[in-house]
């Protein structure tokens, strides 16, 4: 009886310690999310305007207006395009580095140093990275242009930042460069969790490094790969800082992303909070659908 009371007394402390988190979550996460969802069905406009009414006659008016807005469609296309352009090489390089660092036959000296170097871009602030790459690709004077002209690869300086495709490629490269180290660390942690006896058995069967990587490592990393894909998808579809700070969506909305569109609706022009809220809900639905699709695609055959 005393043991049960003691267990209960200890258990209640867990609830007490979780109270601060619950309070902060409700104030800064749950309440803004619910309030944003409500605003999507109202006529709320204007900075500091607290008077708004529900759109009773046309409750989905804001959503229709957003879907009819060409800039919103462009922002969705740009977001997916930039994410795909950076995620494929990001995952490929992260897998290659993971295989290199976790090889059971060739132990690399100074692994800790290389891991820190590869992870370093992830801890640099977005503002610093945007300023750095803006200077690197400056026109007409910039290190990249100077290098290309002096090497004879181009005859005259090229305006990278004024070219739509070039700007998208630069933003995608920045995202790739900033996050491949983080993805590598996640994958390495997954590989270290695989039972070493599996590799020993594969080695006894005569499997080489390539065969062990594709037939042992990759199948056992399925859960980690799913996590990486989902988190990258969510982060990619909500990217804001680099496109905003690098070129502010220019030229001609080439790097306008979905979250930048939402920001522009809410804090530029007519301060259409209702349209911004509706766009946020649409992005949430798109992310949820894409995530569910990835889960269904990567689930085990036994679960189907």
PLM segments and residue spans:
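A structural signal for multi-pass alpha-helical bundles of membrane permease subunits
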Residues: 5-304
